[in-house]
Amino acid sequence: MAKEKIVLAYSGGLDTSVAIQWLVESGYEVIACCLDVGEGKNLDFIKEKAITVGASESYTIDAKEEFAEDFALIALQAHAYYEGKYPLISALSRPLIAKKLVEVARQEGASAIAHGCTGKGNDQVRFEVAIHALAPDLKVVSPVRDWKWSREEEINYAKEHNIPVPIDLDNPFSIDQNLWGRSNECGVLENPWTTPPEAAYDLTVSLEDAPDTPDIVEITFDAGIPISLNGENMSLANLILTLNEIAGKHGVGRIDHIENRLVGIKSREVYECPAAVTLITAHKELEDLTFVREVAHFKPIIEQKISETIYNGLWFSPLTEALVAFLKSTQKFVNGTIRVKLFKGHAIVEGRKSPNSLYDENLATYTSSDTFDQDAAVGFIKLWGLPTKVSAEVNSKVTITTEV
């Protein structure tokens, strides 16, 4: 009798390597699936390791461009910062990983999907809600959450089954990375009073070590999409990765955040997102130049809600679909180039230009070339202030008394 097939989201680390053997012992035929979303994984090594540990098949997928174009771009155009700080690094990759897991499951005829998330984090929610949205018929298994082992028990299990134990197990931090940034938690970071050590950072340098000379970059957008950096056309993934290096060496994008998790607990997170911060800053500036006032004032409401739905694992929900539709409808005229100075942790916009600019220098100037009709202001003020004036006239006739 053929074994039930299960597709495992495989990272190559201890948790998911142990999960392969545990699932095999539980009677499954395990198919491993690993994505590269810009963290620089050695896919060949991971593919081979999955087979060595016990998987019958191992898929490795280079998903950098898809992640950039279909997920990171939405976060960029939404200026997405959960709670005003977190640019949704891990939250963005989970729906793409879930999508690929479902695709592999369909291709292999699998009846279940497994992930390596714990029962305390947000990722278990993101994976399972996404999988159920895409494939309601598939069963979801969570070995790490189910077995409730300690780290020591996992290591002992790995040694008993000749599973290679990663050499970095003494690393005190829990790290997740993709091209949109790097997240870090655990270890000394669990004390919110502790200053993050430099060992917690990888994409950025400290302000003390940042160069004393800034870098000036020019980012060109077409319909809200970054298409070139300093005049060189690039794919979106390559542009983000290149900007991570340039902005990172100036210490741009360090974020230290106390975060309200979906599961109800607070966590202390340290993020590095040099490209994300720089691109969002530039994109927002271009919108300011090209948006009419009403759209500029309303869009932040949509941005906040998109940030929440993505963080909460609702990427494939009807609400997110509707919010993204509005978002995309605003980007048609977001065309132009933004000049940004990167210096000592800051991304500072110093210039902007657009063929769709709504800024009219002749209207804005106070020089003799002014074309603004100041006489029109009298009638505008009268009508604009009319409700306030009427209210004041009516209420000034009313005597308010207070009896004790």
UniProtKB/Swiss-Prot annotation:
Q: Which UniProt keywords apply?
A: Amino-acid biosynthesis, Arginine biosynthesis, ATP-binding, Cytoplasm, Ligase, Nucleotide-binding
Residues that bind ATP, according to the entry? Answer: A9, Y10, S11, G12, G13, L14, D15, T16, S17, G116
Query: Which annotated residues bind L-aspartate?
Result: T118, N122, D123
Say yes or no: keyword Amino-acid biosynthesis present.
yes
TM region positions: none
What catalytic activity does the UniProt entry give for this protein? L-citrulline + L-aspartate + ATP = 2-(N(omega)-L-arginino)succinate + AMP + diphosphate + H(+)
Protein species of origin: Listeria monocytogenes serotype 4a (strain HCC23)
Listed PANTHER family: ARGININOSUCCINATE SYNTHASE (PTHR11587:SF2)
Q: Quote the Pfam families the UniProt record gives.
A: Arginosuc_syn_C, Arginosuc_synth
Q: Where in the cell is it found?
A: Cytoplasm
Molecular function as annotated in GO: argininosuccinate synthase activity; ATP binding
Mention one GO biological process in which this protein takes part, according to its record: argininosuccinate metabolic process
Any idea of its EC number?
6.3.4.5
What name does UniProt use for this protein? Argininosuccinate synthase
